[in-house]
UniProtKB/Swiss-Prot annotation:
HAMAP family, per database record: CinA_B (MF_00226_B)
Family that this chain belongs to: Belongs to the CinA family.
Protein name: Putative competence-damage inducible protein
Superkingdom assignment: Bacteria
Gene that specifies this protein: cinA
Phylogenetic lineage: Bacteria, Bacillati, Bacillota, Bacilli, Bacillales
Amino acid sequence: MKAEIVAVGSELLLGEIANTNAQYLSEWLATCGIDVHYHTVVGDNRERMVEVVTRAQERAELIVITGGLGPTEDDLTKEVVAELLGRTLHVDQPAYDRIEAFLKTRGRTMTENERKQALVIDQADVLTNQAGLAPGMSVQTPDHQYILLPGVPREMKRIIADHFDHLLGKETIKSRTLRFFGIGESALNDRLADLIRTARNPSVAPYAELAEVRLRLTAKALDEQVALDMLDALEQQVLAEVGSHFYGYGETSLPEVVLDRCREAGLTLSAAESLTGGAFASGLTDIQGASAVFRGSAVVYADAAKVNVLGVPQTLLDEQTAVSRDVAVAMAEGARKLYQTDLAIALTGEAGPTSNSGQAVGTVYCALAHSGGTEVLELTYPAFDRGMIRLRSVKDAYFMLLQNISPADEMNKK
């Protein structure tokens, strides 16, 4: 199904307010497996509104219109849609009663303008507005569905939340988001090209995020369990191709999964940070309850701190500089000893913009110390700026941990 979102309001065209409704609606429709092909903004002008809705009828089956349902003379959405459909407006009694009760609490009586908010299009499904006065509505014709929503964001969102289950028909729509790291969007698309191209129901949609990729799977069925089974089957196909990069679902973050995995395995964690300056620890400690797993991080930015706090040999720093594999190993092992943890991560590298070590900017060493020894990951981010190098280093460290921890992991325990 192709959809068009029409936002009504001269204040949007003038830039007085941002069109946040369009973003929210696009995300909502995407989770329902509906492709939004067009966003249109139109002012409070009857002639132009007729033109815009007529064009939307030509290129979309679902037309979602926000704004223009209020009590003023320039709130014209209902009138325009009714006119185009050859229908009339009538008073919805429940909406009228809500408005009247609201006015009574303020010692006011109903005016003609306020009564206007209770008008709905004939044969429309009325969508009660628990966050405001003007109801929304859904109008079905043989060729189109029109969803009319208030322009006030909190009212629009409340109507969608309250009426989601039947707003887009009788089918159950279920979606699931899979999160991936260590693979770019183009590489993931290449690996899943056939699946993305051919899957319709359930469907697959990739989205790039900062150093990550998420896949949204969406299934529609008359029965909820059937839709969930469809998602399970599609997820298995996806993970068969790119499962080594998968780390979680929904809005779960890498540090959340690190903490959960360590907690399940009964492992404790510490860190030693040079170029990241505490960012690795910050990502973990942003999460409540991190102290059950994470013991601390030594931010050893200067070489003297590496020597004094972690016991990194000065001769090693003199011979190899701080940006080296062996120094990363010494930092990780020093942190593991200092904090008495099962695991310790160390990060050292050149974040730029110029190099102090002779190594190329974007060179990073990430070491993981555990009971079986210490592993080192050499990373290069040649085209990144300082902030992105630090961010990617932290995320790569989290992912390195995940690749080396499994639930009930005994081998890494002290």
